[in-house]
Every structure is written in C-alpha cells, then in structure tokens.
C-alpha cells in the first residue's frame, strides 16, 4: 500500500469525488455523476472562499476519499471559530481501512492550526454506522439538527 496524500481537490478530481458522493442509497437519490457541470461551478465557488477546504485523499494516483471542511467565524462561545466537517466519503474498496479516521484526524488538526475552538459535524439519522465511527473518534451527539430545503 502506497503513501497517502491529503490535498486540496481539483477539477480533475471531480469525477471520483462525485462518484463517491453518489455511492450510497442517500447519495444515489441526490447526486448526478453523469453531469459534472453543477459540481464544477460549486468547486469554483469553494476555491474562491478561503474558509472552504474541499480535500481528497489520494493513494498511488487514485482518489480514495474526500471531505469538506468549512470554517465558521462566530460570536457565541466568546467569538469562537468553528469548523464544520461535511461530505465525508471513502471509496467502497477502502472502507474499514482506517482512511476515514485519517481524514477526520487531518480535519481536526487543520482546524486547530487555523485557530478553531470546536469541530462539529452532522450525519443523517439513518447512518448509524457513521454515528458509531464519530463517537469512537470522540465526537458527542449533543444536538438535534434541522434542515429546510429551499
């Protein structure tokens, strides 16, 4: 097994990233890997925002994982900056290899180095395996989340 590189995602990575986003029952309903146009536009917006970090994990030239880290400056908690981890995906062949833990470790270390005081994430209620994974990494299910589609 070769060395792992975690780096900023590029347009060339989009087919692999979107394929991972679509590779589960929830993602299959909302993602469109056959049309990368909206994803290219989204990547341009992410790249233009210094608080956005879309990264990929690459081994032997192959994208095998991804996540998005968003920094959120705020007033609460004495003006704390939070980091939000989203869209954590691991290629099906790499699940159970420890890669997810390494990506989350990268996100925590990066958040700390950028001055964040807290890292948070949400996970769909149906992803009970993911919930256990995050709890093993020290995350606490402390809040109930709500969404409103616009």
Located regions from the model:
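Conserved acetyl-CoA-binding loop-helix of GNAT-fold acetyltransferases
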Residues: 87-90, 96-109, 136
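Conserved acetyl-CoA binding element of GNAT-fold acetyltransferases
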Residues: 79-92, 144
């Amino acid at each position: 097994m070769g060395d792992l590189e975690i780096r900023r995602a590029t347009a060339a990575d989009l087919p692999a990233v979107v394929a991972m986003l679509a590779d589960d029952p929830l993602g299959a309903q909302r993602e469109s890997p056959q049309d990368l146009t909206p994803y290219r536009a989204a990547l341009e917006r992410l790249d233009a925002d210094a608080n956005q970090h879309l990264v990929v994990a690459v081994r032997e030239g192959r994208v095998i994982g991804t996540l998005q880290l968003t920094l959120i400056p705020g007033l609460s908690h004495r003006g704390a900056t939070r980091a939000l981890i989203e869209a954590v995906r691991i290629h099906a062949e790499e699940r159970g290899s420890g890669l997810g833990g390494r990506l989350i470790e990268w996100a925590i270390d990066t958040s700390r180095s950028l001055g964040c005081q807290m890292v948070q994430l949400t996970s769909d209620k149906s992803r009970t395996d993911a919930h256990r994974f995050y709890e093993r990494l020290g995350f606490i299910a402390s809040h109930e989340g709500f969404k409103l589609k616009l």
